[in-house]
Structure formats: C-alpha cells, structure tokens
C-alpha cells in the first residue's frame, strides 16, 4: 500500500512541477515554487524511509545511493532520492540544467561558487535539512558536503536526467 501511495504522491507532485514550469524559461521564482512543492513531498515521511531506501552498507566503498523516483520519457523533470551514510564531498560543479535539493532527513551542506581567475571562489553556503532546500540555476556552481554519522536523505530534482547531462562542468585542483 505504501508503494502505491508513494507512486501516486510522487506523480501528483511531478505533475504540479511540470505544470508550474510548462512552456517557459526557468527562473529563480519558478525554482522557488518547485522547491516548495518538493518540501511538501518531503514532509510525507511515511512514504520515504531508510528501510525502503537504504544507504550503502557500512563496508561498501560507496557513500551514497541515488534512487530514481520519476523521469519523463524525454528525460526531463528527473526526481531522485539521494541517501548517504558516510563522508561525501563533491567538487564544484555546474549541472548545466536547473536543480533543486530538498532535505528529508539529516543535513547536507551546499556551498556556492563564482568562477574566478584561479578557478572558483566560494560566495555562500546553505544547510539542506528537513523543511529546507536550495534552488540552483543552470550556470551556477555548487558543492555538496555530508559528514559521516547519521544517514542523510534528500530529494534531488533536475531539469534533465543525470545520465543526459554530458556537458556538466566540474572544477578541481587539477582543472584550473
């Protein structure tokens, strides 16, 4: 029963998001509405448990699992559930599409960057935790950071499925 309810509620939420963004260029205001829709979905803790979406085993080399919950046939409006159980740090990157990250359980720090002559420079940071989220426009660089300890569960939604983002831009010490 929970699986059927989960599929229905996810479908209803993605339909609202799709309608909100239909036939217009993405803006920070639209992304803010998408973030609010996903915060509402995240409040349905009865549908998203660590039992149904477990993090990697403690002896695994992986520190996070990404579960695809929904994606349109054309690979748009891709919604994932990210679950992490260990130290996770991603280098600064630009998804080249919009992204919204919303907390369900635990804390994920998002740091934001501008390009600089020597690579990138941090300009802001926000903690994603239950009831909060961040919205990221195409062309914006960010990183995610999760500390080991308590599991973290978040929604990550993108304008295109991750497997379709062949032009993503990453910055690290080797790439200046």
Predicted regions and their residues:
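A short hydrophobic beta-strand segment most commonly corresponding to one strand
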Residues: 100-102, 149-166
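Asparagine-centered strand-capping/turn motif at beta-strand->loop junctions
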Residues: 144-148
